[in-house]
Amino acid sequence: MKKTHITEQKFADLDLLPQVIEGLEKKGFDYCTPIQALALPVLLTGQDIAGQAQTGTGKTLAFLTATFNHLLKTPEHEGRKPNQPRAIIMAPTRELAIQIYNDADSLVASTGIKAALAYGGESYDKQLGKIEEGADILIGTTGRIIDFYKQKVFNLNHIQAVVLDEADRMFDLGFIKDIRFLFRRMPEPKDRLNMLFSATLSYRVQELAFEHMHNPEHVVVEPERKTGHRIQEELFYPSNEHKMALLQTLIEEEWPDRAIIFANTKHKCESVWGHLAADGHRVGLLTGDVPQKKREKILEQFTKGDVDLLVATDVAARGLHIPQVTHVFNFDLPDDCEDYVHRIGRTGRAGESGHSISFACEDYAINLPPIEEYIEHAIPMSDYDASALLEDLPAPMRLRTRNPQQRRSNNNGPRNGNRKPNQNRRPRQPRHNKEA
């Protein structure tokens, strides 16, 4: 996956403290993305912002940088105890909260500012212990934050910075009452730095900003199109008979460093997982019934590179923020047009390039016209040579026959023990536009 140039704005040229710049440089960040270049100069003057930017544009680093810098430059309130947060970052999902927390690690190390996590589905006592050790920044989901607040673990009297990430999804998931509950127990908006980020600045999001922020400046980074311009899109029309063989052949040809394969149902995901696992791939499975701890383990394996392929449903994959995903395969075209954009947006993030491959099969080709109407362009189409598809495919594994400790991932041994990359197979035939 190659890195593309982003903007000419260097972090080192902004009014950032040396400790913050050190933390950014440790992560390899030298130049700003467009949302960072627009938002940070505003935030560093102490001005609130309501930012519109798509997932994968670098907004997380923008608000983390501003939050750490603000806390370093602003004296903490007199009488504050170490477990009383100075900043709160609210996310719609626990996966996003965990990702934000992990993204903050280099800034935590370089500044000495402590961060803690609070989200449901994980040990209450473990999170409580971390907060009591000291939590300058509390990152989490609104429900668990409110639980701790009501248990008087901390109060919100010393909040000096607030981040609301993916505000539009907060509305979609019904969390807006929780957000207002927390805002109303913090100091006045003028006495804190407020940051709101959303994929769309709809009327209801702007109303929320007006109600709980202090004259926020709107910062908008419009995508050139709904699907990222760094994502190479490709479409095949496989028969149902060829669909699995085409997927496995393309994986052998592309040999992706890290790929997510989407299917529309839990049953289909399990079937795809079974074929890939039987063929020796290091593959994980995420469906709606995977327990939270197992889910986190699979995501950790995928992020570290112990698992190369992840098969997932849309519901299970919501909130995933995994860096350096090189490929996305739409084994099934989604029923919801927006899900297509969300799926392929897992790759080509924050200046990286990516590749999206979609199958318009006999069952789901009907979903293609509304998707192309929604994204406002036709997906480039490729033909395939059926005679070049893999034929020596083993019978799929079945979940119920596997050891319980291995039920959801197949990551033993070297990568793809049964196969090696083979770019000579060339199942593709010359590409052409559908209009031709």
Curated annotation (Swiss-Prot):
Reaction catalysed by this enzyme: ATP + H2O = ADP + phosphate + H(+)
Motif Q motif per UniProt: ranges: 9-37
One GO term describing the cellular component: cytosol
Record localization: Cytoplasm
Domain Helicase C-terminal: 245-390
PROSITE patterns referenced in this protein's UniProt entry, alphabetically: DEAD_ATP_HELICASE, HELICASE_ATP_BIND_1, HELICASE_CTER, Q_MOTIF
GO biological process: RNA catabolic process
Segments forming domain Helicase ATP-binding: 40-219
Keyword RNA-binding: yes
Similarity comment: family membership: Belongs to the DEAD box helicase family. RhlB subfamily.
Function: DEAD-box RNA helicase involved in RNA degradation. Has RNA-dependent ATPase activity and unwinds double-stranded RNA.
Subunit structure comment from the entry: Component of the RNA degradosome, which is a multiprotein complex involved in RNA processing and mRNA degradation.
Protein name according to UniProt: ATP-dependent RNA helicase RhlB
Lineage: Bacteria, Pseudomonadati, Pseudomonadota, Gammaproteobacteria, Vibrionales
